[in-house]
């Protein structure tokens, strides 16, 4: 029985929880070898029994049988299309239709958001927001896709009155880092946490007495060890993570939460500045 085909064709027959399971299995079929029903249940916010019933609805005796069958189908499909289909990103191949690609990308980003939010320590997050709010000066560092996330955060913080530097040039980033002072904050964004340029900036900032906040993955890394505070992000991307799609989604969820938290701390003044900024930019049209 081709379970992948059955899952794809039975969408209208699924309940809300069953559709969650179906989407997860389709988006993560290449990684099912290391997925248990317990992990799935926790990640999707449903019961393990729901997953077992879903497997039985498709004709399998239980989740283990369904999982092994899906792994086999995926492997056979890869072998069959290996000479023609290119692995484009995560579980997406060149044989996928745009509809399938859209569903896979959407689920991948949903998972990144769900997993990242599940890790939040809100007491620590509140402390981080308070530390940032009192900083005379904020530096944001990052490379590649992380730099884009940092730039977006810098614009948001400047809009509500914070003094922020977010330079693209790594030499300038290092120069700014060594000029930080006690009370200043450096926000270092790096999923790997091992980029030498970022580590150099963090070491310089710490030496000057600045507080370092890292937005990084759960993996042990130089950045994680050096930071005073860490905000964890989760991304399902592995060997194809260079395109950093779900990574940026996870990072943006963290930076947006920081921004809204800072607005909330000083809501009246912040909203006035946002309004003034909007009025000024409207005059440029």
From Swiss-Prot:
Residues 37-56 bind DNA. The keyword Transcription regulation applies. Residues 1-77 form the HTH rpiR-type domain. Residues 128-279 form the SIS domain. Signal peptide: none annotated. The keyword Repressor applies. One of its GO terms (molecular function) is carbohydrate derivative binding. It comes from the Bacteria. GO terms for biological process: carbohydrate derivative metabolic process; N-acetylmuramic acid catabolic process; negative regulation of DNA-templated transcription; regulation of carbohydrate catabolic process. Pathway: Amino-sugar metabolism; N-acetylmuramate degradation [regulation]. Represses the expression of the murPQ operon involved in the uptake and degradation of N-acetylmuramic acid (MurNAc). Binds to two adjacent inverted repeats within the operator region. MurNAc 6-phosphate, the substrate of MurQ, is the specific inducer that weakens binding of MurR to the operator. HAMAP family: HTH_type_MurR. Homotetramer. This is HTH-type transcriptional regulator MurR. It comes from Shigella boydii serotype 4 (strain Sb227). The gene is murR.
């Amino acid at each position: 029985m081709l379970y992948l085909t059955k899952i794809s064709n039975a969408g209208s027959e699924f309940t809300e929880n069953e559709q969650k399971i179906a989407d997860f299995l389709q988006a993560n079929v290449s990684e099912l070898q290391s997925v248990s029903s317990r992990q799935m249940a926790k990640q999707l916010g449903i019961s393990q029994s729901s997953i077992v019933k879903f497997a039985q609805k498709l004709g399998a005796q239980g989740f283990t049988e369904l999982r092994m069958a899906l792994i086999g189908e995926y492997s056979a499909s890869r072998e069959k299309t290996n000479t023609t289909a290119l692995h484009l990103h995560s579980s997406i191949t060149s044989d996928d239709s745009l509809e399938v690609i859209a569903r896979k990308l959407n689920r991948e980003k949903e998972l990144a958001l769900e997993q990242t939010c599940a890790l939040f320590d809100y007491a620590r997050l509140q402390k981080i927001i308070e530390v940032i709010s009192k900083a005379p000066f904020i530096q944001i560092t990052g490379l590649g896709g992380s730099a884009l996330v940092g730039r977006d955060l810098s614009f948001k913080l400047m809009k509500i009155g914070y003094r922020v530097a977010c330079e693209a040039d790594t030499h300038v980033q290092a120069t700014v880092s060594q000029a930080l002072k006690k009370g200043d904050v450096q926000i270092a964004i790096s999923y790997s946490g091992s980029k030498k340029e970022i580590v150099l900036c963090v070491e310089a900032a710490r030496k000057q007495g600045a507080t370092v906040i890292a937005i990084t993955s759960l993996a042990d890394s130089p950045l994680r060890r050096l930071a005073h505070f860490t905000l964890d992000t989760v991304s399902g991307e592995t060997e194809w993570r260079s395109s950093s799609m779900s990574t940026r989604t996870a990072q943006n969820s963290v930076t947006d939460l920081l921004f809204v938290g800072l607005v909330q701390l000083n809501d009246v003044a912040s909203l006035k500045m946002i309004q003034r900024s909007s009025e000024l930019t409207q005059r440029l049209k």
